[in-house]
Amino acid sequence: MNQMLVPQLITVNDYTLAVPALGSAGRYARIVARAEACIARIDQIIDQGFTCSSATSFGKDSTVVLVLMLEAIRRRVEAGLYMPAAFVTNAQTGTENPAMETYAEAMITELEAYCTRLGLPITVVKVQPSMTSTFAYATLGRGKLPVFAGASRSCSVDWKLRPQQKALKQLLSTLQSPGELVTFVGTRLSESATRAANMRERGEEEAGRLVLNEHGSYNCSIIADWEMEEVWEFLMACEAKRGGPYRTFVDSFDWCLELYKEANEGTCAIITGDGGNKAACGSRFGCAWCTVTGERDKSMEAMIASAPEKHGHMLGINRFRNHLINTRWDMGRRDWIGRTTSDAGYINVTGTAYNAEMRRELLRYLLTLDVLEEERAEEHDARMFRGELERTESNEILRGSTFQFITPKNLLAIDFAWSLSYGFDHAFPALSEWYEIRVLGKRYLIDDVTPTEKGIIPEQRWFKFDDWQSPAQEMGLQDAYLEATNKHRYPERPAMRTIRDRFEGKERNIVYYEEADEMEIDPADAMCLVDSFDEAFYTLAKSLSPTDSAKFYLNKGLVKLAKGKAAEYDAMARRAQFWQRMERDLAGTDLRSYIRHHSISNAEHEQILESMKVEPAMQNLAISDLFA
């Protein structure tokens, strides 16, 4: 707190607290009163024995909450009061808006230095979503559709909320007698009608109230009743140059304000001077290609239009996002070969995922965007070195690549998923795409696609396996050669592993694999493999079956499977092999058309399932009649 403010005693939440005299806060008196009430509530929560955490994206709202928690903790430390360990979490999804990601990384560096300098017992935790929930694996690898407007935002839960809760749970387990966890969040009622309704449904409409969440810890919307203008006013109150009464982990939030201004076509600003026009900026930042926002991502478009010299390199990302939107209802990009097998021996025929062609197209686009960004950065750095560009702050930020969406780790995850999917012709299919773009110089620019109008999605149908045998007859992840050679190559470990067959329920030997709590790929191992993927590797891959690369990853321990999930991946491999064999046997007939033509309706399938329930009952009745 700025020393020029004379403390006074006020009562907040039934107890007395020394705070800056509001009269001496001048034009900030109103926001100081609001902030001090929040700080007092946080202090009270700490006094009650709770462990505190702030979940921040470094957007305007979560930054306010972070600063309030930091201020409460700083005062306790300076006063010599007991202060248990606290945490700040930041979710790094790998799909963030590059401008916001660059800003967040800079803020984390400043925050960690601030906590160290002041001796605050705060740990900054950077979390990532589980491998199987990432856009790279789930959408590019497995074909899961992105979350579009009108659907529940499962991406926010999978990519941000769940990883943060998991990380905090692990950290709390290392502490001696930790208190129950309270996470301070920046949700506000005035953000939107939908947000307000959701907050009321969860019981978060009262600022400072502790609300038990589904993870067994508490959420606290400490600024639930703040208006957007108050959010900006508080951030401005943290700057000495504006005469603000607070000091925090950065000297000013000008960078933050500038981002929001640019995301609102360069016209949005807040002026805190006397008589100034206080038009606060309320733009929102989503992921780089957030599809929840509807037909357009107005924030990113505005950033590119208002400051092309700073954000023009994100134009390709916006085109990628629009491509996802424009092809949403294109059923020709869907995979009509399902993944659910019924008790009657049928597999579902439903277009709820992208087909192999669409997944390959999307990967090509992102790989190309990554390469183009590297080329932009190299040219930018060269011009800086030659003195052709001024060494401004914005030019310094643009040095080096500002994004890489397809990292080696992501590439291996996609390659592993494709190796277990129908529609890919040879081993290491994703790595081959990488090689052709990175080494052979291919480029795939995103064309404008006429949006497909929303239509009626065909209902789910069912195709019977029996006519073409069954995936149960396929080899899947079995490999006699690896089983034989592993005994000599790796005598210290089992030559193979045993699982419970998903189709027949019997024990079954498959390739050796390692397990972890969830699917795991070591980034360093991934980088080494990608670097070694040369012309000979590329050529060899063309002569191997897709499943061979999956078995390679598992046998080498490059991909570790989630505990107890190996049988699922074996079943995936066998289904893919079954469809590949069926396609060969059809000798040119389109597989998807054949399956749909020879499938039955959902109603017919339900009748078959019902008859299966009746038959055992009739048999039992007949047996009982024999002994009547």
What would you call each of these model-derived segments?
Residues 2-55, 60-628:
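Nucleotide-activated chemistry modules centered on ATP-dependent adenylation/adenylyltransferase
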